[in-house]
């Protein structure tokens, strides 16, 4: 079985092949996320503590967290599950995955070092690989370099050197800083707030004008109604007087 061991503190990882079954026996029947000592791998691993993070069997099927079996099963997976990437929106598919329990049928077991031991492991803990990309958000850059709000973040952005071309000057590349507060940003914010106040004022004026017009229309309608009532009562009185005069 091969062991893919990574050390996040240095950014390194190493693939070692272990043929001795006795060295691998402590890993058997352990689940993903289980932590155990790596002393069984040899004297140079004394004091190291590793966490099981996953693995693949001999046919290439991955281990899946939460499947409490040591064998292979077929599960109906969607976009919220690991071990499957849907090609269409809402697509589900039945895929073969291996359970989260380690056994001898695995070809690769992934381990993460969570505690360093006494000795350095060549190619794993004795060198550091710098991160290729630095933080992009302004608040993350401030946190990384312990800056205050008055400091200019643009001077501290992590630049990435580009490979040199023959006969040309060496260049570097920097990411666009997100959420950076500049005078232009503040000006846009003031413009947005002014536009919002203008809309509120216009809406209030329109509402007052509409209320005034509605009251005027209701008053006119009421006057017309009263006028109709008066005219109806007047015509009714005239007809009564005409009928009495004929008699």
Swiss-Prot record:
Name of a matching Pfam family: Ribosomal_S6e
Domain of life: Eukaryota
Region feature Disordered, mapped onto this chain: 194-247
Start-end of Basic and acidic residues biased regions: 217-247
Coiled coil: none
CC per GO annotation: ribonucleoprotein complex; ribosome
Gene3D superfamilies: 1.20.5.2650
UniProt KW keywords: Phosphoprotein, Ribonucleoprotein, Ribosomal protein
Role noted for this protein: Component of the 40S small ribosomal subunit. Plays an important role in controlling cell growth and proliferation through the selective translation of particular classes of mRNA.
Homology family: Belongs to the eukaryotic ribosomal protein eS6 family.
Protein name: Small ribosomal subunit protein eS6
Organism: Aplysia californica
Gene (UniProt): RPS6
């Amino acid at each position: 079985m091969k062991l893919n061991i990574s050390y996040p503190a240095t950014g390194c990882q190493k693939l070692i092949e272990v043929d001795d079954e006795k060295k691998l026996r402590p890993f058997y029947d352990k689940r993903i996320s289980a932590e155990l000592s790596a002393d069984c791998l040899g004297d140079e691993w004394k004091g190291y503590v590793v966490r099981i993070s996953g693995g693949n069997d001999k046919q290439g099927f991955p281990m899946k967290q939460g499947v409490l079996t040591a064998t292979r099963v077929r599960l109906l997976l969607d976009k919220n599950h690991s071990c499957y990437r849907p090609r269409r929106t809402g697509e589900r598919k039945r895929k073969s995955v291996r359970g989260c329990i380690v056994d001898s049928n695995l070809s690769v077991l992934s381990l993460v070092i969570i505690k360093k031991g006494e000795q350095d492991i060549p190619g794993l803990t004795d060198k550091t690989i710098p991160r290729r990309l630095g933080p992009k958000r302004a608040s993350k850059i401030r946190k990384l370099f312990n800056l205050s709000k008055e400091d200019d973040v643009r001077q501290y952005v992590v630049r990435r050197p580009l490979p040199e071309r023959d006969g040309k000057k060496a260049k570097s590349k920097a990411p666009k800083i997100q959420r950076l507060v500049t005078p232009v940003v503040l000006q846009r914010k003031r413009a947005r707030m002014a536009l919002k106040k203008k809309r509120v004022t216009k809406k209030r004026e329109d509402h007052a004008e509409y209320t005034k017009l509605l009251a005027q229309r209701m008053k006119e309608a009421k006057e017309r109604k009263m006028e109709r009532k008066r005219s109806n009562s007047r015509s009714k009185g005239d007809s009564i007087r005409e009928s009495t005069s004929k008699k």
